[in-house]
Amino acid sequence: MKNYEQKIANLRMRKLAQTQEKIEKEGLLDEDDYGRVVPPENLWNIIPNHPDGSFYGFDAWTDNFCSLMNIHPVYIDADDAFAGRWMYFMSKMRPNKWNPDYSYDFLKENIKKYDLICGIGDDAHFAPDYEIGVKLGWNGLIKKIEHYQSIHHSEEQQHFYSLHLRVIRSVQGWIQRHIDQAYRMAASATDDCSKNNLLEIAKVNERIIN
């Protein structure tokens, strides 16, 4: 029990330190704290596809996400039960969130008039069905996409499915790097509790990736 109490104390102290680092480097944020940690400086920047310096559309979102996942740092804490930490707020790195080529000026008067919280250009809170992912797993999602890709043959449909496959495989690559790191850390662990925890992290993520 004492071992677990110490692990909890260690995690709490690291969390407080990580939150303080975010405040010092990024300023105060009037929103959720999230589980994010500060990323290394100058490791990754967005890939614009528009003269305004931002990116829009399926292709650009896929290119940016996969580019980020391919270099996203691995994070494993031997005291923690989870692998990985979110470091980048990709959507907030865009200078603009709505493509100016598709004006919605005709809506702005009523948005202001009725004091609407406008979601145009936002990219989250679409209420995805997580049960699908839990039931199928990452490889199951790939098989489902490949199934529909095999029966819908238009160029647009084929491209749409190929982008989804790229995204899933980039996530799998990120998970695999954590698996590899967990095994490396377990091999050099000096106490059985940490070693077993790291091995369990690796094995659980091997199941998740498949």
Predicted regions and their residues:
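Long, non-catalytic protein-protein interaction scaffolds
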Residues: 1-148
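Structured, charged N-terminal subsegments at the starts of enzyme catalytic cores
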Residues: 134, 138-210
